Amino acid sequence: MFGGGARRRNPGPQKGRDVRYRVEIAFEDAVTGARRRMSMADGSALDVNIPAGITSGQVLRLKSQGQPSPSGGAPGDALLEVDVLASPVWTRDGKDLRMALSVDLRTAVLGGTVEARTPSGPVSLKVPAGTNTGAQLRLKGKGVQLTPPGDLYVRVEIVLSDPKDDGLRKWAEGR
């Protein structure tokens, strides 16, 4: 009366296997977002949308870019574990970026405009008269391009444009 066992359902075609890759992303691409063609370890190339604000250790999932299904189902996904490369110019602090910028003594004393490098390109930065080494100047909206975007904080480092300047030496000795 109750025998015969349970019927097995045919699960249908199975999805292909997911494939994991580790990828290195340029600091600028992680900050501003980008679309890049990346070569994978197996020789394949994938077009990847890199979202602004991505950090090392996050995983990007590319649907149907993994192994094909052995039973006619959908292909698996490609899982890209991200490693954001360090920048020689900027460091990241959440949504904000930080950098040091050399400013000549004349500009620091009298004030002026200098060029500051941002991940999206160079911008003009106003240096107020009397700026000291270590002063922090803010470039609003020039940090990680999230909503709202972060800021770029520039730490001023005063440098002598000509350390053998006789006028500067005489001024210093006259004190």
Name each model-derived stretch.
Residues 49-175:
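Intrinsically disordered, low-complexity linker/assembly segments
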Residues 39-41, 117:
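A generic structural motif
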Residues 1-38, 70-73, 79:
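Post-J-domain flank of DnaJ/Hsp40 co-chaperones
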Residues 8-10, 43, 86:
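Short acidic (Asp/Glu) patches
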Residues 25, 42-46, 121-123:
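Short acidic/polar mixed-charge low-complexity motifs
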